[in-house]
Amino acid sequence: MAAPNVRSSSSFSRNISVVSSPQIPGLKSGPNGTAFISSGIRDLDRILGGGYPLGSLVMVMEDPEAPHHMDLLRTYMSQGLVNNQPLLYASPSKDPKGFLGTLPHPASSKEDKPTAPDPDQGESLRIAWQYRKYLENQKNAIDDYSNDFDMRKPLERQFLSGRPIDCVSLLDSSDLSIAQDHCATFLSKFPRNSSNIASIGRIAIQSFCSPLCEYSEKESDMLSFIRLLKSMLMVSNAVAIVTFPPSLLSPSSSKRLQHMADTLLSIKAIPDGDKELEKLLTGYKDINGFLNIHKVARINTQVPVILEAKTFSMSLKKRRFLALECLNQAPVDGSSGTSYGTSGSCSSKSGALDF
């Protein structure tokens, strides 16, 4: 008599909740059961492999000479409000609600709806019309996930009125108990207890270590808060982005904060009047700053991310739309040689421009 076929179970098993096909706007499925929300910048979503994974902590290191971390916050918050996602915003300002008036508005899309082709024009034109319709359907699917934002146009009231927005002032706070209570209450609304995602939450904390807050001298309390926030995010359908100035922290505390981040970014100012850099980079006059990617979140996998580049230029296309581009080295001596990195691909070699 043949022995029964018994499957041996291992103590090491992958605990991955299967994410069903997203039915709510602003959510996209990824590999290994990962779900993404958009950063509000399409270039950044593409670079990060889809956006910010649900349950992840994003930290942005500020540069006092470049306030472009505010642009990352603005697009992130606007994207959530456009997709009707609840928002918790905390900042060291007396009136944090005033910051909502600076959020950018999604760009108006000028859609040229295709008209049915003339039957007398032949089969080739009919196929071309169907292909054009397919491309527009693909574009509409992208718009449901992410938008291009006009940085010069404020977000209209229709996206602010009646939306679940919680604003918290960290000014003159002696400790982080108020912020901790707000985060715990907010994240309790988005438990990750099933494969079906009903709603998504977004948390944005600006200048976490600002000297305007009394708790800024208690580095151990700040580390404990970030550790607790990350643990709550891991069991929630939410994402938190926290900006902080590393220069105001001790080197050890700054490193520990960076280590706790799932996705770690930094902003660098572009030097004013740097003639050498102007000769080195193409489009130098259009560059507002640099974005460095130090770490990319990896959820449900141990495979590391290999980026084509880690430093990108930040610029405003048409002086309105925030864009990220690989750094391109200008031809030497006016020759038409190959640049350091083309627009289609970025060099992985380290150079003087790696910050």
UniProtKB/Swiss-Prot annotation:
Family to which the UniProt record says this protein belongs: Belongs to the ELP4 family.
The alphabetized list of GO BP terms reads: abscisic acid-activated signaling pathway; auxin-activated signaling pathway; cellular response to sucrose stimulus; negative regulation of anthocyanin metabolic process; positive regulation of cell population proliferation; regulation of auxin mediated signaling pathway; regulation of carbon utilization; regulation of leaf development
Q: Which PANTHER family match?
A: ELONGATOR COMPLEX PROTEIN 4 (PTHR12896:SF1), PAX6 NEIGHBOR PROTEIN PAXNEB (PTHR12896)
Provide the protein name.
Elongator complex protein 4
Q: In which tissues is it expressed?
A: Expressed in meristematic tissues of roots, leaves, stems, seedlings, cotyledons, flowers, siliques, guard cells, floral buds, and shoot apices.
* Free-text disruption phenotype from the record: Narrow leaves and reduced root growth that results from a decreased cell division rate and a reduced apical dominance. Delayed germination after imbibition. Enhancement of germination and inhibition of leaf growth at high sucrose concentrations. Hypersensitive to abscisic acid (ABA) in seed germination and seedling growth. At the cellular level, hypotonic vacuole, alterations in the size of grana and starch grains in the chloroplasts, and massive presence of Golgi vesicles in the cytoplasm.
Sorted keywords for this record are: Abscisic acid signaling pathway, Auxin signaling pathway, Cytoplasm, Developmental protein, Nucleus, tRNA processing
SUPFAM superfamilies this protein is in? Answer: P-loop containing nucleoside triphosphate hydrolases (SSF52540)
Keyword set includes Zinc-finger: no
| Disordered as annotated region, ranges | 1-32, 99-122, 334-355
| Free-text function comment from the UniProt entry | Component of the elongator complex which is required for multiple tRNA modifications, including mcm5U (5-methoxycarbonylmethyl uridine), mcm5s2U (5-methoxycarbonylmethyl-2-thiouridine), and ncm5U (5-carbamoylmethyl uridine). The elongator complex catalyzes the formation of carboxymethyluridine in the wobble base at position 34 in tRNAs. Promotes organ development by modulating cell division rate. May regulate mechanisms producing carbon assimilates or importing sucrose. Involved in the repression of the abscisic acid (ABA) signaling pathway during seed germination and seedling growth.
GO cellular component, alphabetical, reads: cytoplasm; elongator holoenzyme complex; nucleus
- Pathways involved: tRNA modification; 5-methoxycarbonylmethyl-2-thiouridine-tRNA biosynthesis
Quote the InterPro entries the UniProt record gives: Elongator_complex_protein_4, P-loop_NTPase
Q: Would you say which domain of life the source belongs to?
A: Eukaryota
The subcellular location is: Cytoplasm; Nucleus
Coarse class of the protein's main subcellular location: cytoplasm
Assembly state and interactors? Component of the elongator complex which consists of ELP1/ELO2, ELP2, ELP3/ELO3, ELP4/ELO1, ELP5, and ELP6. Interacts directly with ELP6.
Biased-composition ranges, Low complexity, are: 1-21
